[in-house]
């Protein structure tokens, strides 16, 4: 897909701020994502500039004449609705979901509650506030069990617990990052991820990526800084399975009221091939190791054109009227 095929008037995009860095635990990855996006947009003739909220107040965006923002921030104070809320007040359109959808998606427990209420499959879970409650959750959910902060990304603070004796340490690690700790039933099977682009009934899933990590250890280091993890796109899954994953992620995206773009993580249980939603990322990575560019490329969208397409979708909640927030079940 070329820039001409996208039919985007680059000049009409105006002066663009690529928000990167920030103050979250994912700052380093955000700087890599933002650097890639910045270079890509400039290669397409966009008047794009780096902007780090850790060093500059967001109010400066208005003062310096920025007309829209590409959010390449990850984690807290980046994809949790706070920056989105500030940009709403400034009246500067931004990429990705709005305030409410961003804040909900950042909270894994709230996300799972909403998905479960809409009939979407997600692993059983417990919200815990102590190591004793973590041990109780382990007895109820069984082994293995995943323990992780409710509001962090990139597997930060995550532990795969295989014995009762690991519960205390796993809880302490997760609680360092968030007082709300999620214990989740582990799904043994294929790990996959699937990006979504668009809004409402126009939202569409890109090709599914199947992930093979060493000993199933798809952690922060393996995600961004090594080449030991293998990514399969095409996924190699049966066509019916891939289409079902795409259908589920689009429904999950729409149920939360997302717009612009996101990426959902899904496990396929080996015993019966049933897919389970784990979480949705509303400001996915755009590094050299990132998965949205890989999937987009498989569907014929280059990295620069992907960045341009996402930027062109920048909007404000005030312009949406909550359009596309209803769940609904859409085919892909």
UniProtKB/Swiss-Prot annotation:
Its cofactor is Mg(2+); Mn(2+). Keywords: ATP-binding, Cell shape, Cell wall biogenesis/degradation, Cytoplasm, Ligase, Magnesium, Manganese, Metal-binding, Nucleotide-binding, Peptidoglycan synthesis. Its main location: cytoplasm. GO terms for biological process: cell wall organization; peptidoglycan biosynthetic process; regulation of cell shape. One of its GO terms (cellular component) is cytosol. Residues 112-312 form the ATP-grasp domain. Its EC number is 6.3.2.4. ATP binds at residues 138-193. Pathway: Cell wall biogenesis; peptidoglycan biosynthesis. Binds 2 magnesium or manganese ions per subunit. It catalyses: 2 D-alanine + ATP = D-alanyl-D-alanine + ADP + phosphate + H(+). Mg(2+) 2 binds at residues 279, 281. One of its GO terms (molecular function) is D-alanine-D-alanine ligase activity. SUPFAM superfamilies: Glutathione synthetase ATP-binding domain-like, PreATP-grasp domain. It is found in: Cytoplasm. Mg(2+) 1 binds at residues 265, 279. Cell wall formation. Belongs to the D-alanine--D-alanine ligase family. This is D-alanine--D-alanine ligase. It comes from Acidovorax sp. (strain JS42). The lineage of its organism: Bacteria, Pseudomonadati, Pseudomonadota, Betaproteobacteria, Burkholderiales. The gene is ddl.
């Amino acid at each position: 897909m070329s820039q001409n095929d996208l039919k985007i008037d680059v000049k009409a995009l105006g002066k663009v701020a690529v928000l990167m860095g920030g103050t979250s635990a994912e700052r380093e990855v955000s700087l890599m994502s933002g650097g890639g996006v910045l270079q890509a947009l400039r290669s397409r003739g966009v008047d794009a500039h780096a902007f780090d909220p850790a060093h500059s107040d967001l109010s400066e965006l208005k003062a310096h004449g920025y007309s829209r923002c590409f959010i390449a921030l990850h984690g807290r104070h980046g994809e949790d609705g706070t920056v989105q809320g500030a940009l709403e007040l400034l009246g500067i359109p931004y990429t990705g979901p709005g305030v409410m959808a961003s804040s909900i998606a950042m909270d894994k427990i709230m996300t799972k509650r909403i998905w479960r209420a809409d009939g979407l499959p997600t692993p059983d879970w417990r919200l815990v506030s102590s190591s004793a409650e973590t041990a109780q959750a382990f007895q109820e959910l069984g082994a293995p069990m995943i323990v992780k902060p409710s509001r962090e990304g990139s597997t930060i603070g995550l532990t795969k617990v295989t014995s009762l004796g690991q519960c205390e340490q796993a809880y302490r690690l997760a609680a360092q990052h968030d007082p709300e700790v999620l214990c989740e039933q582990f799904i043994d099977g294929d790990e996959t991820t699937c990006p979504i682009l668009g809004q409402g009934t126009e939202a569409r899933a890109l090709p599914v990526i199947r992930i093979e990590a060493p000993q199933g250890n798809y952690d922060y280091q393996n995600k961004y800084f090594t080449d030991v993890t293998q990514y399969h796109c095409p996924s190699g899954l049966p066509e019916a399975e891939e289409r079902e994953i795409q259908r589920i992620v689009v429904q999950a995206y729409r149920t939360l009221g997302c717009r612009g773009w996101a990426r959902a993580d899904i496990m396929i249980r080996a015993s019966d091939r049933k897919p389970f939603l784990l979480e949705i990322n509303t400001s996915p990575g755009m590094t050299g190791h990132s998965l949205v560019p890989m999937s987009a490329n498989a569907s014929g969208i280059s990295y620069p054109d992907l960045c341009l397409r996402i930027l062109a979708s920048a909007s404000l909640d005030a312009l949406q009227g909550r359009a596309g927030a209803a769940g609904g079940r859409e085919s892909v």
